[in-house]
Design a protein with these regions (language model features):
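Formylglycine-dependent sulfatase
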Residues: 1-257
């Protein structure tokens, strides 16, 4: 489902919303059927991984996810203290003496679409610079401005992701760490978030896997449900039998399907 909590619960449990129970926003008191449902955090924790979460979790009940490290638990829609995401990531990675799983939830893909934060992007776009996002279907000046500010958020987010990758590189652990970049749903614009149109359900999934085949642009249909079994394969543990997803390792390795 193209909603925050539903998508996050699906990613963390490897189950569809109707299977795990998180069919609405945690803000509105929707919750999973049970805190005992297997999830990424519990499974990797039992496998010896240190687990961490930076940014909002937005899934109920939160106690179902026993992270070893937590920071910046708010949604932070005002974008205050954005350097704190990379700073806390540095603290977590530096203090981790065993394999780790860290998820970082940046607010900058979310409304409000702020034109600039911390001087980023250096050259913000305006509605005169872009067309409206194609799936909107209407190229109105107001929608062009919305699209421009969404692009400004994405350019800024790109800078913040660069900060995180530098932190990882400086830790000396980059060559032994898989990095996955995803969104929880499409852009919060017309025919995007909250809908089942392509603009709502299609999201980025970029994987940097040391030893994998780089530079690929795969066309297979995959989903965030495939990440839990992928992480299980990385950790060398058996995934729960109930998971509908499959490990993405063969695709990352360049194998045909």
């Amino acid at each position: 489902q193209a909603g925050c909590s539903q998508s996050r619960a699906a990613f963390l449990t490897g189950l569809y919303p109707h299977q795990n129970g998180q069919i609405g926003l945690a803000t509105w008191k929707y919750a999973m059927f049970s805190e005992k449902i297997p999830n990424v955090v519990k499974t990797l924790g039992k496998a010896g991984y240190r687990t961490g979460n930076i940014g909002k979790l937005h899934v109920n009940p939160e106690k179902a996810f026993p992270f070893d490290f937590k920071a910046i638990p708010s949604a932070n829609f005002s974008r205050k203290g954005m350097s704190g995401y990379a700073e806390n990531a540095k603290k977590f990675i530096k203090s981790s003496k065993r394999p780790f799983y860290l998820q970082i939830n940046h607010p900058d893909a979310h409304r409000p679409f702020l034109k600039t934060v911390d001087g980023l992007p250096a050259k913000p776009l305006t509605g005169r610079d872009v067309d409206a996002l194609p799936f909107m279907g209407i190229n109105h000046p107001e929608l062009r401005q919305q699209s421009a500010d969404y692009y400004n958020c994405m350019m800024r987010l790109d800078s913040y992701i660069g900060d995180l990758l530098r932190v990882l590189a400086e830790s000396g652990k980059a060559k032994n760490t898989v990095v996955v970049y995803i969104g929880d749903h499409g852009a919060d614009v017309m025919r995007g978030k909250r809908t089942s149109y392509e603009g709502g359900v299609r999201i980025p999934m970029i994987i940097r896997w040391p030893g994998g085949k780089s530079g690929q642009d795969r066309k297979e249909l995959v989903s965030t449900l495939d990440l839990f079994p992928t992480f299980c394969e990385i950790a060398g543990v058996k995934p729960p039998a109930s998971l509908p997803g499959r490990s993405l390792r063969p695709l990352v390795a360049g194998e045909s399907t």
